[in-house]
Curated annotation (Swiss-Prot):
Gene3D superfamilies: 3.40.50.2020. It comes from Paraburkholderia phytofirmans (strain DSM 17436 / LMG 22146 / PsJN). Catalyzes the conversion of uracil and 5-phospho-alpha-D-ribose 1-diphosphate (PRPP) to UMP and diphosphate. This is Uracil phosphoribosyltransferase. Belongs to the UPRTase family. The keyword Metal-binding does not apply. 5-phospho-alpha-D-ribose 1-diphosphate binds at R85, R110, D135, P136, M137, V138, A139, T140, G141, Y142, S143, D206.
């Protein structure tokens, strides 16, 4: 895991398997089926990395031999909240890692001026949970900021929120950091820039279209 000195709350997950799978996802000739499978696999690997610092406590239990105080994750179960629609492709990988997690959804689409328009919010109870928001792309950063806003408006502390994405543009990371410096953003790659259409370069295209086999 590495950091970029420009963005204190950005963490780049540079594990070789993550980078290898991301390269295959970038390839324009990768099929919808393979893209979908890779998204699940890479999200599972990234989820393993970002959950390493979850708060722990102990629980008294009995093994076949003795009683012990065994380490367990503290608080309520994790909540996974994909940002629709592309984020839903990441939830399977996270649920494979944490099958007992609660799942919410935040639906956002991008208007012509690239600003987010919210159309759906469904969340589990919020108290004492750690939330993982997920969306494959942080391009302009507006949708990611909006998703965090949704949780913070409901009194979820920034320290209890993580945002997980595959690729991000520096422009979007700056917007995110300015809005939510207390929320950690985890990505597989910090790419070069946004083009005139607000697509990440080199990026991987429209993640939603490639995930679901649709045309923009």
């Amino acid at each position: 895991m590495t950091q970029d000195s420009r963005f204190p709350n950005l963490f780049i997950l540079d594990h070789p398997l993550i980078q290898h799978k991301l390269s295959h996802m970038r390839d324009r000739d990768t099929s919808t089926r393979t893209f979908r499978e890779l998204l699940r696999e890479i999200t599972l690997l990234m989820g393993y990395e970002i959950t390493r610092n979850l708060p722990m406590t102990t629980r008294r239990l009995t093994t076949p031999l003795v009683e012990i105080d065994a380490p367990v994750i503290a608080g309520k179960k994790l909540a996974i909240v994909p940002v629709l629609r592309a984020g839903i492709g990441m939830s399977d990988g996270l649920l494979e890692l944490v099958p007992s997690a609660r799942v919410g959804h935040i639906g956002v689409y991008r208007a012509e001026d690239h600003r987010p328009v919210e159309y759906l919010v469904r969340l589990p109870d919020l108290e004492d949970r750690v939330f993982i928001l997920c969306d494959p792309m942080v391009a302009t950063g507006y949708s990611a900021v909006h998703a965090v806003d949704v949780l913070k408006r409901r009194n979820v502390a920034g320290e209890n929120i993580m945002f997980l994405a595959l690729v991000a543009a520096p422009e979007g990371v700056q917007v995110f950091q300015d809005a939510h410096p207390d929320v950690k953003l985890y990505v597989a790659s910090l790419d070069s820039h946004l083009n005139e259409h607000a697509y990440i370069v080199p990026g991987l295209g429209d993640a939603g279209d490639r995930l679901f086999g649709t045309k923009n």
